[in-house]
Amino acid sequence: MYRLFFLLILCPFLYSQDLGKILWGEKPLTSPLNFDYILAESKNKNNVNLSGSFYINSYPKGVGYEVIRDQKTFKNRNNENLFLKFPEFKLDLSIQDQKVVIHNKKIIETDDAFWDLSFSDGMAWSKEDHVYVSAPFTLIQKHANCSHNGVLLFALNSLNEISQSIFQISSETCAYFQFNYVGIFDSFFDTKDINKEIISKKYDKKTIEDLYERYPSILRGSFADSDAFNIGEVTAYGFFDGEDHFIGPCLTRSGNYPFCDDLLLPAYSLTKTISGSLGIAAYQKNMDRLLIWG
């Protein structure tokens, strides 16, 4: 049986609690995770390599949610029904030192009435003879242009036994339906050999501040860091100059998102952004020509 517990925004984030005891069921989860805590913990090295299949009992042992925005125009369901059960899935993953490689990164079309799922590559670290695994996941509304981004977290002991897992959502790309969510689940990990996926080299990642320093002619506040944007409604922003990828902070309601490189965005929203950016660039280029010719 599952039980519901409701988390208030005034609850302190889990930053100093013993995460290990919570995952292994020795202490209750009483508040959401602070994602900055995951970033800090992930600095611990890991030299354990293994692979297997990860899945959960889809009915949570405990779940809390807070609906922040729900426009009635789009409402065709009871919100409570959305969180009674997590969509079923099975992940094949490999822990390769600090990296966690998800081998089935495609969108998972589930039998759930409301949600599809997607997972991407994450990170691993060791602490007190346990390997901690964290990876990004996204709940995708069926037949809609909305994605709700979260973080998965669990641990494995020296016998490859798995702890409970935590799923938490604190951001989204969705104008009409927004919520905070955290659930804790009984979990399973079946070790098995998986052909190792070669981790492709990514472009060097730098901050937006690095961009302004490299290109002094670009005024600060030229991107989504401008006052013209409501930073609370910006999922991600950045700039690629052909060599380096300059990324702005992926802010959430629970600190900085630990997996800004692997953030799933709705196709329609992303297409609008890319098309608009290219259109403005082309317009500016033509205007410069007109000014020169004039």
Where are these regions (language model features)?
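Sec-dependent N-terminal signal peptides
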Residues: Y2-L14
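Extended hydrophobic/Leu-rich segments
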Residues: F13-L14, L19, L23, I38, ...
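Active-site helix/loop module of the DD-peptidase/beta-lactamase fold
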Residues: D18-S53, K285-G294
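Short Lys/Arg-enriched alpha/beta "domain-start" segment
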Residues: D36-D116
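A short, well-structured edge-of-sheet supersecondary motif
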Residues: L153, P216-F259
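Active-site SXXK
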Residues: P266-R289
